[in-house]
Regions:
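Class I SAM-dependent transferase core
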Residues: 1-64, 72-75, 80, 93-103, ...
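Conserved nucleotide-cofactor-binding alpha/beta core module
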Residues: 52, 56-175
Length: 199
């Protein structure tokens, strides 16, 4: 799976000033390269590789990505899957990701601007869903939009206690999940919040 990180040149998706660090074990900032100003970051290469490994994408899979960012993970998934719908809430970041994807001929990607923090029913059902930001709780909308046998990767919880979770749709309305590892990830914009008790 790590070989795929070299098939699609990662450095070409990184803002110019950070290209020397493209394969470093770091989250690289995107905001200066995109003027999005939101403090967004590229995932570490090892996290990208782990997500691809866990999702085990097939040529027939339809994928939803929530949070396009640089477009690199989008391109990796598009290389493996039939089609990828990627939704980015920040127009400037969407433009940066779109430019990167177009330069690399990712013609099986649909990139849309919008708020998909609770799901994106437009192209559902999906065989795989990836949330590139964390969410305190996993919205039911994503589970409802998984096809039978579909897999969802999300980082769930609040800092400092977050879990990378893989959810599999076992039947309509039913799913199983496994917590893979602990990590900390920036939250999705407008992520669903748990109900808080007030006294």
């Amino acid at each position: 799976m790590l070989d795929l990180l070299y098939v699609i040149p990662r450095e070409e998706f990184v803002p110019q000033q950070h290209r020397a660090l493209a394969f470093s074990d770091l989250e690289l900032p995107l905001e200066k390269g995109t003027k999005a100003g939101a403090g967004e970051r590229m995932w570490q290469p090892k996290l990208e590789a782990r997500v691809l490994q866990e999702l085990a994408l097939k040529r027939t899979d339809r994928v939803l990505e929530v949070g396009t960012g640089s477009g690199y993970l989008t391109a990796l998934m598009a290389y493996r899957a039939a089609e990828v719908c990627s939704v980015e809430i920040r127009p400037a970041l969407a433009a940066f990701g779109r430019g990167n994807l177009e330069r690399h001929g990712a013609d099986n990607v649909t990139l849309e601007v919008g708020d998909a923090a609770r799901g994106w029913a437009r192209h559902a059902p999906y065989d795989a869903i990836v949330l590139t930001g964390s969410t305190p709780i996993l919205p039911q909308g994503f589970l409802d939009q998984l096809a039978a046998g579909g897999r969802l990767f999300a980082v769930v919880g609040e800092a400092p206690a977050m879990q990378a979770r893989l959810v599999t749709c076992t039947a309509p309305g039913a799913s199983s999940s496994v917590d893979l590892f602990e990590t900390v990830l920036r939250p999705l914009a407008n992520a669903e919040q748990p109900q808080r008790f007030r006294f």
